[in-house]
Amino acid sequence: MLTGSGPQDRDETIFHHKPFAVIADKLTRSGYGVLRYDDRGVGLSKGNQLNSTSFDFAQDAAAAYHLIKKEYPASSVGFIGHSEGGMIAQIADSLVNGAAFHIYLAGPGISTVDLMIKQNARYLKDIMTEEGVHTYITQLRPIFEVIGGSEELSIKQDAINKQAKRLYNSLDPKDATKVAPSDLAYAMSMSSLVYNKWMTFFFGYEPKRYLTQIMCPILALNGSEDFQVVPANLEAIKRDAIKADVTTIELEGLNHLFQNCKRCTLPEYNMLTETFSEDAMETMVEWLTAKGF
């Protein structure tokens, strides 16, 4: 099981919720063996989290895969990834010469630049004018593209500084103050991202590069109320995983953590008592059974 972005333990602990512990319990009770592990630099795992990218995490996932195959060579071993964990599964598949199956829990299908543009638009619509949101996301895209580009750091930083100030000063002052106190502060915060190895890899990631090569069955799930990885993402997975048997399902009323939500906002994650939808877990088990695993 592959966790989402940020330092995560084996339970993918988020607030008071431990979704991976809940999912693992469900799968184990259904007859499936599960391997969970702390991310590098977290819990009992060694390594440097800060200087690692999703590719590094995919290498860890591949190592976990090979560990299981060594102990249980006849077993079918697949990846279950939540959010960035879906990205990690896509990359890891290329490192292990093909897993038995993939399950993406809000895993990316569209480019991460597109994903983050949609995420920002959804978040900002609650605090900005409609015109402000349109202006912001239109001019934000070039910044994200530069962050994920291959130019030298000094060139990237200069380009982002200029574009960030241009973006900030094009906004209505009331909208501008929602993102930063000044154009300089905004430019500094955005240009600093080029020094983050994880961020530069993330914004340069194109799922299509890996999806087109995956040959195992894929189950891709998204909650209808997910504003971090929008449900429209599912179509891209079905379109680009041309060699795979792909099943995509949009689960009604669920957020990014696969909780039944009411307001379906980020602060609500912590307020909800449900950790992970039983329907979502049943969907996974039924799919695995139907595929003969």
Regions found by a protein language model. Give the residues of each.
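Short, surface-exposed "cap/lid" segments of acyl-processing enzymes
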Residues: M1-K26
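Alpha/beta-hydrolase active-site loop
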Residues: P19, L50-E71
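Conserved alpha/beta-hydrolase
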Residues: P19-L44
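Primarily recognizes the serine-hydrolase "nucleophile elbow" in alpha/beta-hydrolase
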Residues: A63-K125, T129
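Accessory cap/linker subdomain of secreted extracellular hydrolases
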Residues: L105-F201, Y205-R209
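Short beta-strand/loop motif that positions the catalytic acidic residue
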Residues: I214, A220-N222
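Conserved alpha/beta-hydrolase "acid-adjacent" motif
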Residues: F227-N233
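Catalytic active-site module of serine/aspartate enzymes centered on a nucleophile-bearing elbow/loop
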Residues: L254-L257, R263-F293
